[in-house]
């Protein structure tokens, strides 16, 4: 009977509450004893030494009885031989100190009683994204070596071109193309730095040149006055300075020279010339052919 009570005391159901898994401390037997009418005490009895009535139909040596009342009384809770009362789980005696209520997977050591802790953490270790392998030697196939080198060179060249484009975009050139820049340097500019319209200037210059050419052609096309005319023959006498004309006119040398100068230059504008009254009279006499003037 004593061995049976010991076995039942060792392998009885754990008396630990369900909230002990969340970190609460187990209650002491003194805290359970109190003047409370709604608290159910535990009374354990044994056959033989206690002298109480035992049901003949029950074959168990110990039984649990729940009753209301004062738990402090030692008569209601006798201590049998070989039976131990403890609020802790009997798993402590076997070496396990974990509560009966377990949590989920991240706390695997609590679920497996520390067995998994010997293997270390089971989480994945993320590798770095940029793994520098230039320092270490890389072994490749001999047939693929030249292709790998060629691709690496092309990638390096593309990266260099990209860097150059980035730098060129930062410092922009003042012109779009070098040929346009040279053409802009050759074009004439005005005082404000703007380009001059050379087409209109070329048209104006060609028009003035054409006008000048037409005037020279007109001057060249006009015949020069003849020195000797069949109708008006001139005879100059240097002694007396007089001139006899065939039509009966006698004019002094000074007047004749001035008249010849006037007649030899008909192209000049009349607005800038001042004709004396004597010259006008001589010209009228020559046209009429009936007067003789002497000075």
Curated annotation (Swiss-Prot):
Disulfide bonds: none annotated. The keyword DNA-binding applies. SMART domains: CBF. Heterotrimeric transcription factor composed of three components, NF-YA, NF-YB and NF-YC. NF-YB and NF-YC must interact and dimerize for NF-YA association and DNA binding. Component of a heat stress-inducible transcriptional complex with NF-YA and NF-YB subunits made, at least, of NFYA2, NFYB3 and DPB3-1 in cooperation with DREB2A. Residues 178-189 have a biased composition (Basic residues). The gene is NFYA2. This is Nuclear transcription factor Y subunit A-2. Belongs to the NFYA/HAP2 subunit family. Ubiquitous. Expressed in seedlings, roots, petioles, hypocotyls, reproductive organ tissues and leaves. One of its GO terms (biological process) is response to heat.
């Amino acid at each position: 009977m004593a061995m049976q009570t010991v076995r039942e005391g060792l392998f009885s159901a754990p008396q630990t509450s369900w909230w002990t898994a969340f970190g609460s401390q187990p209650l002491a037997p003194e805290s359970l004893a109190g003047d409370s009418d709604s608290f159910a005490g535990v009374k354990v009895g044994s056959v033989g030494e206690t002298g109480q009535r035992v049901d003949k139909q029950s074959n168990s040596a110990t039984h649990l009885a729940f009753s209301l009342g004062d738990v402090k009384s030692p008569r209601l809770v006798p201590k049998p031989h070989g039976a131990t009362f403890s609020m802790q789980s009997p798993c402590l005696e076997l070496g396990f100190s974990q509560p009966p209520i377990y949590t989920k997977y991240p706390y695997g050591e609590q679920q497996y009683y520390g067995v998994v802790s010997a293997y270390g953490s089971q989480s994945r270790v993320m590798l770095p994204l940029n793994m520098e392998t230039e320092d270490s030697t890389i072994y490749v196939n001999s047939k693929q070596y030249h292709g790998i080198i060629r691709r690496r060179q092309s990638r390096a060249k593309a990266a260099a071109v990209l860097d150059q484009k980035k730098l060129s975009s930062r410092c922009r050139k003042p012109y779009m193309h070098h040929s346009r820049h040279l053409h802009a340097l050759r074009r004439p500019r005005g005082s404000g730095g703007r380009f001059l319209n050379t087409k209109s200037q070329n048209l104006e210059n060609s028009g003035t040149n054409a006008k000048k050419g037409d005037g020279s052609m007109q001057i060249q096309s006009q015949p020069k006055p003849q020195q000797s005319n069949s109708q008006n023959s001139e005879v100059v006498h240097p002694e007396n300075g007089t001139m006899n004309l065939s039509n009966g006119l006698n004019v002094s040398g000074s007047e004749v020279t001035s008249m010849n100068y006037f007649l030899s230059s008909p192209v000049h504008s009349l607005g800038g010339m001042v004709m004396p009254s004597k010259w006008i009279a001589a010209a009228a006499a020559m046209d009429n052919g009936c007067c003789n003037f002497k000075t």
